Amino acid sequence: QRVILISPMIGVTSFARFSGVAGWPSFLPAFAKAAWLTIMPEFNPFKFNSFPTNAARQSFLLTSALQTQIAADSRNKKLDQLPPIMTFQSAMDSTVSARAVITALYNRLPVNHSEVVLFDLNHAVRFNALLRRSSYTALSRLLPTPPRRYDTTIITNVTAGSTEMEIRTIPAGKTEQIVEKMGLRYLPDVYSL
């Protein structure tokens, strides 16, 4: 038995807390578009481009309640009853917080063979116009120093200049990583998985 999570909404940016304020003018007919944080053509079948302000506010309220519940369950040892969790998360996800997945969930889990799989940025191609300089070191700031109570797998470039990908795994309770070639390459126009 295992729980599989794909880019779980454990946390969102703190800006979402105030997104309801951005929608206030929408009560006036001339400002109806203010009910949306962004309005764009829906060209991406895997992600909504337009996003209503109320959805951002509700996402913040939901994740705040979820984090409170996880913390309480951790203190009361209820998380010990969970089966192992396996999470797939992009380090560059701009919709949900990768940091919250680690700090609010994984760092509270007991030792139970849980694993987080993180997809790193494609370091072989520089997307300077799209990304902040800090994006290239985001993953190193995301994880606590090993040993950890959960397995950590990172899918990244073999070297910063290579599009060849590898898997770097640090098992729970260990500090040494195991490196394995994937036999795959990042596409030149992909900055993250």
PLM regions and their residue ranges:
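Short, well-ordered alpha-helical segments in soluble proteins
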Residues: 7, 35, 63-67
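Surface-exposed loop and adjacent secondary-structure segments within mature catalytic domains
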Residues: 17, 21-27
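A structural motif
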Residues: 25-38
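Active-site nucleophile loop of the alpha/beta-hydrolase fold
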Residues: 4-17, 121
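Short, proline-centered helix/strand-breaking motifs
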Residues: 8, 21-22, 52, 84
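Flexible glycine/proline-enriched surface loops and loop-helix/loop-strand junctions
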Residues: 37-45
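Serine-hydrolase catalytic core
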Residues: 47-193
